[in-house]
Curated annotation (Swiss-Prot):
The protein's assembly and partners: Homodimer. Forms dimeric beta-barrel. Interacts with TGD5.
Name of the protein described by the UniProt record: Protein TRIGALACTOSYLDIACYLGLYCEROL 4, chloroplastic
Molecular functions per Gene Ontology: phosphatidic acid binding; protein homodimerization activity
Phenotype for residue 20 to L: In tgd4-1; accumulation of trigalactosyldiacylglycerol (TGDG) in leaves and slightly pale green phenotype
Domain of life according to the entry: Eukaryota
Keywords: Chloroplast, Endoplasmic reticulum, Lipid transport, Membrane, Plastid, Plastid outer membrane, Transmembrane, Transmembrane helix, Transport
Effect listed in the UniProt record for changing residue 139 to A: No effect on phosphatidic acid binding
Record carries keyword Transmembrane helix: yes
GO cellular component, one term: chloroplast envelope
Membrane topology: Single-pass membrane protein
Entry text on domains: Amino acids 110-145 are necessary and sufficient for phosphatidic acid binding, while amino acids 1-80 are only necessary.
Membrane-traversing stretches: 288-310
């Protein structure tokens, strides 16, 4: 219903993370200082629309997923393998209603195995076993239902309303969301209310916030030039770790309160090499955005200012700041508020071989990204190292640690035709850990199927070993 806009891989603002934990299929990054902002992401199809696409155009009547946890399962948070199916009702060209159903296959099999009819050495008849299966299929705790209504209010305005219920109970611990999006010629305006809001922190842990509301005004991603974000975020209620009975300390930014973030950045690109071999005229590339061999570098510099009012005041983040992470900061205890400003930077390298047109091995793509999210820490560390070297002194490990970037690398290789394999991983550098200063974290493996007829779209089957999650999804205009 709404036109797609391309999300560039070099854009500095974080995207929502895909996750099968909920029916909606996404989790927002926990806001931090300076990044993530908390509401900054690319346009994507809603989960019901993705599932409907697989049903209609890819001959997939059931969509599988796996997650070790599920909301409100009532069995200690256990998840497992599940299947999804959607029913859509297009009432008009401007109004689409969908009902997304999810069946917990793993729990169903587990419950069946516990019954006497399927026990070891059982002499039950076929009729008895079928009766047992039918009885368990009626167990509403095996099902989750998601109602979604999408309105195209105007060519530039959309409204999405969703209501998800688990264990077949529409009133017990539901998850609801309302999203309004307006597209200006050069900007996107998004207003969102979620109850509860699902967030994921940097350790991969999920948190529920009883009520989360946000308004985001963002300029569209550009190949080069300035961009900005204005983000107003309000939390209400005490956050709780998903499927945890213990009272754990939540990230400060999820506590009740109001925060306002203003971020500006400038991006520049430079081609080191671009292939001149003519493309095949007899066939189209599998993906138009992956059809040009090249080697390019890009850089982003920017700054973020944050004002917080309430329990989510940024004061607690600086009291425990042992590494000098925080930038310029002020705190006003009398009104329970604070202010912070910091700089940030990013450098990236992309190298691609092949036009992604031939049937075999016509695409090899490598991407490396260095993030410097705390400009003041980097500046103080670089200054300290430079002074020590000029004075013929050995720089300290603490100074070197401050200038170490956050690293993300990805490699994509065509296998056959539109199929390609992709692996993405973060690299953490901790020079103070002499035994293991470099660790690989947040690795994700994926098989991608390029949908050639849609120019730049792909069906993605991904697996995250850290979170033990498996998911099938549809993505548009993303590299």
């Amino acid at each position: 219903m709404n036109r797609m806009r391309w999300v560039g891989e070099g854009d500095i603002w974080d995207l929502d993370m895909s996750t099968p934990v909920t029916l909606e299929g996404t989790a927002r990054a926990v806001p931090d200082d300076p990044l993530p902002l908390g509401l900054s992401r690319g346009t994507r199809l809603s989960r019901p629309k993705q599932v409907e696409f697989f049903h209609r155009f890819m001959a997939s009547p059931l969509i599988p997923s796996f997650s070790p946890i599920r909301p409100n399962t009532g069995d200690g948070g256990g998840g497992g393998f599940s299947l999804q199916r959607v029913l859509t009702l297009p009432f008009s060209n401007n109004w689409l209603v969908s009902l997304l159903g999810q069946f917990d296959v793993q729990r169903f099999v587990t419950e069946i195995d516990k019954t006497k009819a399927f026990g070891r050495g059982s002499s039950s008849t076929v009729a008895s076993r079928l009766n047992t299966i039918g009885k368990h299929l009626k167990d509403k705790s095996l099902y989750a239902l998601g109602f979604c209504s999408e309105f195209l209010l105007s060519p530039d305005d959309t409204l999405l309303l969703s209501y998800d219920a688990y264990k077949g109970d529409l009133d017990k611990n539901p998850r609801a969301k309302a999203i309004f999006n307006h597209e200006f010629p050069l900007h996107n305006l998004t207003a969102e209310a979620v109850w509860p809001g699902l967030f994921v922190d940097k350790h991969g842990e999920y948190w529920d916030v009883p009520l989360s509301m946000a308004i985001d005004l963002a300029s569209l991603p550009a190949e080069s030039g300035p961009s900005y974000h204005l983000c107003l975020h309000h939390n209400s209620g005490s956050p709780k770790k998903l499927h945890s009975d213990t009272m754990e300390v939540p990230p400060p930014s999820l506590l009740p309160g109001l925060s306002l973030k203003s971020a500006v950045s400038y991006r520049t690109n430079m081609d080191l090499w671009r292939g001149t071999t003519p493309k095949l005229e007899t066939c189209k590339p599998y993906d138009v955005f992956l059809s040009s061999p090249h080697v390019a570098v890009s850089g982003i510099i920017g700054s973020v200012m944050t004002a917080a009012f309430g329990e989510n005041s940024i004061r607690s983040k600086f009291e425990n700041d042992s590494e000098g992470v925080g930038g310029f900061s002020l705190h006003f205890p009398s009104v329970n508020s604070g202010f912070m400003a910091d700089a940030l930077g990013r450098a990236s390298l992309t190298a691609q071989y092949g036009n992604f047109q031939k049937f075999f091995f016509d695409l090899t793509r490598f991407h490396a990204r260095l993030d410097f999210p705390h400009g003041l820490r980097f500046l103080t560390g670089a200054t300290s190292v430079a002074q020590d070297l000029l004075n013929s002194r050995q720089p300290s490990l603490e100074a070197f640690q401050k200038i170490c970037p956050e690293v993300l690398v990805s490699l994509q290789q065509q296998i056959v035709g539109p199929f390609s394999f992709k692996v993405e991983s973060g690299i953490e550098i901790d020079l103070r850990n002499g035994a293991n200063p470099v660790t690989v974290d947040k690795t994700v493996f994926a098989i991608e199927y390029a949908l050639q007829v849609l120019l730049s779209a792909k069906a993605v089957v991904s697996y995250s070993p850290k979170q033990n999650e498996f998911m099938v999804e549809l993505r548009f205009f993303e590299t």
